[in-house]
């Protein structure tokens, strides 16, 4: 980029300070350090997964273009559905709306027709049980962050009715697992 390390470091400090200025907190130095460290962790993953022109390799291994949204990956939803995504709905709603759209694209490009379980770089690694993306979508819709309810509902129903995943066939037949 023709910039020195010092110039890049200063640009990173400026970007980070623009994120921090949205928060005014009180507490001890240790409590503030804990808050800002946790905030930093919310900005690491999920990560942007597309080229500068919006192209990305989808779950179907084809090249797709993110139109009108930023595509994300690294959805460790077992870890993030309870706190990170609800937090992002409050402080970074546009970012979380893009994550929800990315999850829906994941479902549409999946041979299983499922929202992400634990996606990594255009692949599903199936390392957790459950389908926590449904909670993320429902929360984003309820908070007014994501408005394409029909598309989201179709993805949630598709995900929750895949018969060969996590005993769903037995649940649908018997009403319990």
What kind of region is each of these model predictions?
Residues 73-177:
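Aromatic-rich carbohydrate-recognition surfaces in CAZymes
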Residues 1-71, 105, 113, 146-165:
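Acidic/polar, glycine-enriched structural segments that form the non-catalytic walls/loops
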């Amino acid at each position: 980029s023709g910039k020195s390390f010092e110039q890049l470091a200063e640009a990173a400090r400026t970007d980070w300070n623009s994120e921090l200025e949205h928060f005014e907190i009180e507490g001890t130095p240790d409590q503030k350090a804990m808050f800002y460290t946790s905030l930093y962790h919310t900005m690491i993953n999920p990560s942007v997964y597309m080229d500068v022109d919006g192209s990305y390799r989808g779950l179907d291994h084809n090249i797709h273009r993110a139109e009108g949204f930023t595509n994300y990956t690294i959805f460790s939803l077992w870890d993030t559905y309870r706190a990170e995504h609800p937090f992002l709905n409050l402080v970074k709603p546009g970012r979380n709306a893009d994550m929800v759209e990315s999850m829906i694209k994941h479902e549409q490009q999946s041979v299983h027709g499922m929202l992400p379980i634990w996606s990594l770089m255009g692949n599903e690694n199936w390392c957790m049980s459950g389908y926590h993306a449904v909670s993320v979508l429902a929360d984003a819709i309820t908070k007014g962050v994501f408005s394409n309810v029909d598309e989201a509902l179709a993805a949630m129903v598709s995900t929750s009715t895949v018969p060969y995943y996590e005993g769903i066939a037995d649940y649908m037949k018997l009403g319990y697992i």
